[in-house]
Amino acid sequence: MKSSIKYVIVQDYETGGLPSSTKKPFLDVPLCEVACVVVDMEKLEIIDEYQDMFKPNYKEGLVYEPKALEVNGLTLSMLEERGKDAKEVYNNLKQLYLKYKNPRQGAVVCGHNFTGFDHPFTIELFAYHGDDVWKYVKWVEDTQKLAYYANLEQQDYKLATCCADNNIALTGAHRAINDTRSNAQLFISYIKKLRGEGIAVSKEENKPFREQFKFQIPS
């Protein structure tokens, strides 16, 4: 049976702060920028990219933390000049999810620390516009989780460290499209390892289990 996973969308946000128990993603902590990179799961190649900025103050009460903007290099004037209305970005994301949906699993999205940080922003973005992201996205993957599984010990499990350990360049970090391109390559490297690419398999190991198994009677 052939896999029905044709595409994975690697996604990243830049935000104006960090969520907490008192500050909800998107509703209190503003979205500034989104980027997506689409991976063809048969060829393991990047086949499409998307990025947008959000116009600032898309709702009342948003607080843009200076330290957060300093890290990602964005300014409110940049967001005002290049940003789009949150509703337009929501629609663009929805169309991307629909374009690259898989036959059984719908859209599959992935990122680094994506489950804990990024995806809750998507959930609230869609809910704010009267929609449910789970209508389009069925599976959520996380390269940070894959790193924990793949490596029992390393310096840390940040994106930069994981990329460096896998010989993947990460330039212009903390801008959404740059992080996402490198993260897509990291995801591809993990998938290649899962598929055993580049790993030599002996003829004996390649035999079906029935041929390898030899029943022995205890003496």
Regions found by a protein language model. Give the residues of each.
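Conserved non-catalytic scaffold segment of RNase H-like nuclease domains
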Residues: 2-123, 164, 168, 174
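Short alpha-helix plus adjacent loop in nuclease-associated cores
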Residues: 140-154
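A structural motif
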Residues: 151-164
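Acidic two-metal-ion nuclease catalytic site recognized across multiple nuclease folds
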Residues: 2-3, 165, 181-219
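Active-site flanking residues adjacent to catalytic metal/cofactor-binding acidic residues
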Residues: 11, 141, 178
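Substrate-recognition/cap helix-loop segment adjacent to the acidic, metal-dependent catalytic center
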Residues: 117-139
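Residue-level recognition of the N-termini of beta-strands and the immediately preceding loop/turn
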Residues: 105-108, 136-141
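Active-site metal-coordination segments of metallo-dependent hydrolases
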Residues: 152, 171-177
